[in-house]
């Protein structure tokens, strides 16, 4: 394009161009700098079209409104799984009591899905146009995006042509891709997992050898002889055949069925306990923890590579903006030399950048500290480090009172000792609830006398209300609301007050033998339980007042935004496995009396799927499938589910559940532990804390590891800029 052919630097702004052309060029430079800065802040690639029309489209596409709409469309197409056949609209997932669910008519969800696919097609078209044909052909994610859309559209057409009666909908399995491709951090996490797979596979091979060897040894040790009595045969049931033995030891690897597997053999001969102890020591305590260590080490290394790429993108985007905005000076007739970016040139760019007010003010203050002189490249780069820091909020000023009495009261109620008093009162309230729970544990709700507890609730809630009013008086309403703990405390206090007023209006004042009849949707006992539950939650207010607990809580809260990528990967895994499970196991779990495979309740084996009432663990709809997968991921009693599906669906169902265990409990949990450990180690490292500025806090994974990442060299940045297909520099 014409605008792209002109060099961005070195243009003679004093030439005889018409004023409108010079103004258009200057406006284009500003827009280019704005986009480069936004790319740097968001760690986006700068390899896209740079003409005026493309820049407008690019900024519109990455605007908050457009991205939120795209995020909602992704959420909408994923949530369709709860509505589509088989629908999850039943009160219970238990196959014994589940009613016939409402099923949407053919074409309803397909229409919504068509709208979503059309939106994704527009999304792909915009992305493809902005990066250009050359970049599009090299971008595997965009090519995969195109293929997923093609398969989804073809499958959608097949669904309509078969009147929504097709047995398999392939596009459901592909839906999580739309979530993956929209998150750069999820892509990096997935790439890190892929790079870590060889090392995981090596430990997995060791685990497989360990399992096979001990399975063979177990079969040799615990083989049932011809002369064994019936009770001995029952004791050795876990090693009846090779698949049974392998399954038993695999479950024992997760310690889920310990000591169930060991006790039958141990009962016969106490020396057999050594077999299970050695197996558990090698498998669970050594190899599984070795797998955790390897995943932590490998993932951390590959995560550093991904974050190094993000840092390079940040520096490259900032350097591109610097090159666009930098002025040149030099004697007449010589090649002008770069002298830097003037603050008056940069401030209009900063005003147009999509950035929150706090960070803009922080960057402006840093720019003003240069006292009007041009900023050099390193100084310009450091401006955008402010984006990763959350500045400490300045508390609003307290109200000014003239009366000495009011000033004394303000001092008392704003002192931290007043908070300690409130914590003691909250502790007393919690203890009183515990006392009554113990005293009334053997009584039915109708037999309990709630007179004393009701009076205590009134007294404590009255104190909480007075505490709220006193704090508002001392700090002022803006000052009171500036503390998150006060907002949490005040909100619960207001809810408690409203609940108590409703109780008074319906059931009047409490008195001895107070057992009124139920009026409205909630009984007196329900109202009391609701208020006491809120009081228990209110006790969490003590966390900010206990420093070690507050540090742990702040670390966890700071970790939550950085876990979105890991949470997204888990959502993708759940979604795909749930869809596969529905296609494989829908309808295989049948209620008692409907199949010869289902034993009568009286004849069910103790500890079996039927005897434990695990009927809701099925794949008859999407919601039930998610809960079943969750129960398997937790691995508590998961052998019961494995054994049941082996009976109902066949022995090959074990492959599905073992794969899910590997993906969720082994790989994902260990990746989560890796990030959690790194986060805690870094945040609690005294050296790390010394590097933080006073009044700031770390916000992102990139900043968390910034001190151990290598800064890109200027030569590398300039080489990449010169290779930009739509950007032409003079040097």
From Swiss-Prot:
Extracellular compartment spans: 90-111, 161-167, 225-238, 264-270, 439-449, 508-524, 586-618, 642-656
Pfam families: Ion_trans
SUPFAM superfamilies: Voltage-gated potassium channels
UniProt modification remark: N-glycosylated.
Annotated phenotype, changing residue 643 to A: Partial loss of selectivity for calcium over monocovalent cations
Protein transport as UniProt keyword: no
Knockout mutant characteristics: Loss of NAADP-mediated calcium release. Mutant mice are highly susceptible to hepatic cholesterol overload, have hyperlipoproteinaemia and liver damage consistent with non-alcoholic fatty liver hepatitis. TPCN1 and TPCN2 double knockouts are viable, fertile, have no obvious morphological abnormalities, and no obvious behavioral defects. After fasting for 3 days, they are less active and endurance performance is reduced by 8.3 fold in contrast to wild-type littermates that show no changes. Two days after re-introduction of food, mutants regain endurance and become as active as before fasting.
Annotated spans, Interaction with phosphatidylinositol 3,5-bisphosphate: 187-191
Gene Ontology CC annotations of this record: cytosol; endolysosome membrane; late endosome membrane; lysosomal membrane; lysosome; melanosome membrane; monoatomic ion channel complex
Location in the cell: Late endosome membrane; Lysosome membrane; Melanosome membrane
GO biological process, one term: endosome to lysosome transport of low-density lipoprotein particle
Function: Intracellular channel initially characterized as a non-selective Ca(2+)-permeable channel activated by NAADP (nicotinic acid adenine dinucleotide phosphate), it is also a highly-selective Na(+) channel activated directly by PI(3,5)P2 (phosphatidylinositol 3,5-bisphosphate). Localizes to the lysosomal and late endosome membranes where it regulates organellar membrane excitability, membrane trafficking, and pH homeostasis. Is associated with a plethora of physiological processes, including mTOR-dependent nutrient sensing, skin pigmentation and autophagy. (Microbial infection) During Ebola virus (EBOV) infection, controls the movement of endosomes containing virus particles and is required by EBOV to escape from the endosomal network into the cell cytoplasm.
Subunit text: Homodimer. Interacts with LRRK2. Interacts with HAX1. Interacts with MTOR; the interaction is required for TPCN2 ATP sensitivity. Found in a complex with LSM12, TPCN1 and TPCN2. Interacts with LSM12.
Protein name: Two pore channel protein 2
Species of provenance: Mus musculus (Mouse)
Lineage, top ranks: Eukaryota, Metazoa, Chordata, Craniata, Vertebrata
């Amino acid at each position: 394009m014409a605008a792209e052919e002109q060099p961005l630097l070195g243009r003679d702004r004093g030439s005889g161009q018409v004023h409108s052309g010079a103004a258009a060029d200057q406006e284009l430079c500003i827009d280019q700098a704005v986009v480069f800065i936004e790319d740097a802040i968001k760690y986006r690639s700068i390899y896209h079209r740079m003409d005026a029309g493309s820049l407008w489209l690019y900024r519109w596409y990455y605007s908050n409104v457009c991205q939120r709409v795209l995020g909602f469309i992704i959420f909408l197409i994923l949530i369709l799984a709860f509505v589509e056949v088989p629908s999850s609209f039943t009160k219970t997932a238990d196959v014994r009591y589940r009613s016939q669910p409402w099923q949407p008519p053919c074409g309803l969800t397909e229409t919504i899905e068509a709208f979503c696919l059309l939106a994704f097609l527009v999304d792909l078209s915009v992305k493809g146009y902005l990066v250009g044909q050359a970049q599009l052909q090299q971008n595997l994610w965009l090519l995969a995006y195109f293929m997923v859309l093609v398969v989804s559209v073809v499958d959608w057409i097949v669904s309509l042509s078969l009147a929504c009666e097709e047995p398999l909908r392939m596009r459901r399995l592909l839906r999580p891709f739309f979530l993956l491709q929209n998150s750069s951090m999820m892509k990096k996490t997935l790439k890190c997992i892929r790079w870590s797979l060889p090392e995981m596979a090596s430990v997995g091979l060791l685990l497989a050898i360990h399992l096979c060897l001990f399975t063979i040894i177990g079969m040799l040790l615990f083989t049932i002889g011809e002369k064994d009595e019936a009770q001995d045969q029952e004791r050795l049931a876990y090693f009846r055949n090779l698949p049974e033995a392998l399954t038993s030891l695999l479950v024992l690897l997760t310690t889920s069925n310990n000591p169930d597997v060991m006790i039958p053999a141990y009962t016969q001969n106490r020396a057999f306990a050594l077999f299970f102890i050695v197996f558990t020591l090698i498998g669970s305590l050594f190899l599984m923890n070795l797998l955790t260590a390897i995943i932590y080490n490998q993932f951390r290394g590959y995560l550093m590579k991904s974050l190094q790429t993000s840092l390079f993108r940040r520096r490259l985007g900032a350097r591109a903006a610097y090159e666009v905005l930098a002025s040149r000076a030099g004697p007449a007739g010589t090649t002008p030399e770069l002298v830097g970016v003037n603050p008056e040139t940069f401030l209009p760019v900063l005003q147009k950048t999509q950035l929150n007010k706090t960070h803009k003010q922080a960057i402006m203050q840093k720019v003003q500290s240069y006292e009007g002189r041009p900023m050099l490249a390193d100084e310009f780069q450091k401006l955008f480090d402010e984006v990763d820091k959350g500045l400490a909020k300045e508390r609003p000023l307290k109200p000014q009172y003239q009366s000495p009495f009011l000033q004394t009261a303000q001092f008392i109620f704003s002192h931290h000792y007043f908070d300690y008093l409130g914590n003691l009162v909250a502790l007393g309230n919690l203890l009183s609830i515990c006392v009554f729970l113990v005293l009334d544990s053997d009584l039915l709700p109708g037999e309990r006398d709630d007179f004393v507890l009701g009076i205590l609730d009134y007294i404590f809630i009255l104190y909480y209300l007075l505490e709220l009013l006193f704090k508002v008086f001392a700090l002022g309403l803006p000052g009171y609301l500036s503390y998150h703990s006060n907002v949490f405390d005040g909100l619960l206090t207001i809810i408690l007050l409203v609940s108590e007023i409703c109780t008074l209006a319906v059931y009047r004042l409490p008195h001895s033998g107070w057992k009124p009849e139920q009026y409205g949707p909630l009984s007196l006992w329900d109202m009391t339980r609701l208020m006491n539950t809120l009081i228990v939650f209110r006790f969490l207010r003590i966390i900010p007042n206990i420093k070690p607990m507050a540090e742990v809580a702040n670390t966890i809260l700071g970790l939550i935004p950085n876990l979105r990528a890991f949470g997204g990967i888990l959502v993708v895994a759940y979604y795909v496995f749930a869809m596969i499970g529905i296609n494989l196991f829908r309808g295989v779990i049948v209620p008692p009396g409907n199949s010869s495979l289902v034993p009568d309740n009286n004849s069910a084996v103790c500890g079996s799927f039927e005897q434990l009432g695990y009927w809701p663990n099925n794949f008859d709809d999407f919601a039930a499938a998610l809960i079943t997968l969750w129960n398997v991921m937790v691995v508590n009693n998961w052998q019961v589910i494995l054994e049941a599906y082996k009976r109902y669906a066949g022995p090959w169902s074990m492959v599905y559940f073992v794969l899910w265990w590997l993906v969720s409990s082994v790989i994902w949990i260990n990746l989560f532990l890796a990030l959690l450990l790194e986060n805690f180690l870094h945040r609690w490292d005294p050296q790390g804390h010394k590097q933080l500025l006073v009044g700031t806090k770390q916000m992102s994974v990139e900043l968390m590891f910034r001190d151990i990442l290598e800064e890109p060299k200027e030569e590398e940045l300039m080489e990449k800029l010169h290779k930009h297909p739509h950007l032409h520099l003079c040097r």
